[in-house]
């Protein structure tokens, strides 16, 4: 199988989709049959599950979710840091800046949420954001127009226009601070 070959030649194996518990999710069974060691990581983030990390042979294994925005989010925030550490670079957290929102938001608390956001202007040096509507995880088009992630902490229930939130720009150039 491709996983067997990769486990003998690659430093890191990354897959997307097929890691959950449904009938079509075959990777956990295959991974076990090949002698891999893995753990489903319960991350309290949205989007971002299921996420599996482990080893297959000498390779680090990252099993990312299947929805496009979930894949991008978990790789950008977790996978890329793993690769940097594996390559011997120091670990660094993404740049976060304060931004204002131009929307209202009501949400259930409990998980940190990373929602694709677009800078639509500036209030002085502070970016003003618009965000993707809920249900965005399967729509890759939300990433095409996004400048970064609006970050909503686990305890946040409501935002009103003019409130602030953290913003993680995809490019430091987008921050313009």
Stretches with model-predicted labels:
Residues 1-33:
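N-terminal small/polar loop signature for handling phosphorylated ligands or for N-terminal nucleophile
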Residues 30-177:
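Flexible glycine/proline-rich
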């Amino acid at each position: 199988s491709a996983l067997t070959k990769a486990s003998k030649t690659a430093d890191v194996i990354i897959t997307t989709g097929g890691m959950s518990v449904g009938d079509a999710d075959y990777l956990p069974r295959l991974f076990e049959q090949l002698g891999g060691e893995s753990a489903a990581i319960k991350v309290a983030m949205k989007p971002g599950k299921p996420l599996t990390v482990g080893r297959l042979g000498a390779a680090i294994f990252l099993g990312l979710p299947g929805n496009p925005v979930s894949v991008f989010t978990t790789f950008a925030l977790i996978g890329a840091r793993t690769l940097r550490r594996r390559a011997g670079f120091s670990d660094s957290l993404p740049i976060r800046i304060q931004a204002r929102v131009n929307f209202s938001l009501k949400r259930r608390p409990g998980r940190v949420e990373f929602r694709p956001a677009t800078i639509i202007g500036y209030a002085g040096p502070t970016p003003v954001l618009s965000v993707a509507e809920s249900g965005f995880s399967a729509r890759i088009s939300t990433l095409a127009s996004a400048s970064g992630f609006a970050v909503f902490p686990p305890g946040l229930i409501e935002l009103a226009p003019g409130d602030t939130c953290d913003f993680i720009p995809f490019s430091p150039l987008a921050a313009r601070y």
